[in-house]
């Protein structure tokens, strides 16, 4: 099963639906979702269905891993075990083009909210989170 860390718009999230930018967490070798999407954009560390993470990642299958998401204004970075995997800027023409080519194309203003909620989601496998921290950057 897949697991994701989401950021959700305060205005766009419906009570029955949680749609937002996703840091994809899964075992690329074992989960079928890693084989879907375009050019690896549904693999570990990717911005789900939008931006693929590199093929080679510092992923430890037998222990806890450290995932970090840094958001400063519209600039976002995905880190795994101290290695930056991807970075992107929301609210740009490039961002809007990525969204238009994704499964989120029908969600107005997808991913552009300045604030929202955080969601940890799993689709069926056992997954553990520990030491979850949120720090406001200045």
Task: Describe each PLM feature range.
Residues 1-7:
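Short, exposed "boundary/linker" segments that immediately precede the start
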Residues 9-138:
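Carbohydrate-interacting regions of secretory-pathway proteins
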């Amino acid at each position: 099963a897949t697991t994701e860390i989401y950021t959700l718009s305060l205005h766009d999230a419906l009570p029955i639906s949680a749609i937002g930018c996703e840091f994809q967490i899964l075992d690329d070798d074992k989960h079928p979702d890693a084989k879907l999407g375009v050019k690896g954009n549904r693999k570990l560390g990717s911005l789900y269905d939008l931006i693929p993470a590199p093929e080679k990642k510092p992923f430890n299958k037998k222990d806890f891993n450290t995932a970090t998401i840094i958001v400063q204004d519209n600039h976002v970075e995905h880190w795994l075990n101290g290695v930056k995997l991807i970075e992107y800027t929301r609210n740009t023409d490039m961002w809007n083009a990525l969204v238009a080519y994704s499964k989120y194309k029908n969600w107005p203003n997808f991913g552009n909210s300045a604030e929202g909620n955080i969601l940890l989601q799993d689709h069926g496998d056992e997954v553990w989170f520990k030491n979850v921290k949120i720090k406001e950057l200045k």
